[in-house]
Amino acid sequence: EILAPFLKDDGKLTLAQFRHNDGSLKEERSIFWARVSERLMQRLTEQSDYFGEVANIELDPPLLSPPQHEQFDMVLTFRNAHIWNESGHLYGTLQSIFQALKPGGVLGMVEHRSARLSDISSSAVEGYLDEAYVIAAAERAGFQLLQSSEINANPKDTKDYPKGVYALPPTLAMGLTDRDYYLAIGESDRMTLKFTKPARAAAD
């Protein structure tokens, strides 16, 4: 709703969609996200006057399909890294993104931030990721950190809830239990990171 109209007349937006369900998906979570992608693609078609021409590729972590080689000036990802990490594909997905970016291109990342500063990763239960861990994974994939911001920080997020980050809005996984408490905290504390693919580097 923001990027598509902004790029409609001067640029091009490509969405990395969840894997299409061709009947082979068995995992409930994958089937759910395939439906989300289908609804989004239908909306883009129905409201093409507003969104313009939006391209679609598939991201089935860690791979983009079709493979992308130095195609993009910028890649943005919002609260996806913990999902990639939980399936063991954080580093591999970052490698695919690195390959897809043009030299000098930018990766922007927003992610739920854990309270720790260490080399540990996230667990599927909590949904948070350690900022140092994310930066290290991106640098290992070839990126250089340009800047970090506290624009999405939330000091009220204590990160110790029974269902992890999913207890907070918008998910509110605890249902009616302590709902007002979680609404008062608001959405999660998040890292906001800006990386670049060095101009001298070329994708393999």
Language-model region placement:
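A short glycine-rich, Lys/Arg-flanked "PGG" loop and its adjoining helix->strand segment in the class I
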Residues: A4-K8, L90-P103
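Conserved beta-strand signature within the Rossmann-like core of class I S-adenosyl-L-methionine
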Residues: L13-A16, G104-H112
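S-adenosyl-L-methionine
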Residues: E28-L64
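Short alpha-helix
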Residues: M41, G127-S148
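A short acidic, Gly/Pro-enriched loop at the edge of an enzyme's catalytic core
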Residues: S65-V75
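A short beta-strand submotif of the Rossmann-like class I SAM-dependent methyltransferase core
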Residues: M74-N80, E86
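Short, glycine-/aromatic-enriched active-site segment of Class I SAM-dependent methyltransferases
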Residues: G108-A124
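Core SAM-dependent methyltransferase catalytic element
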Residues: T158-D204
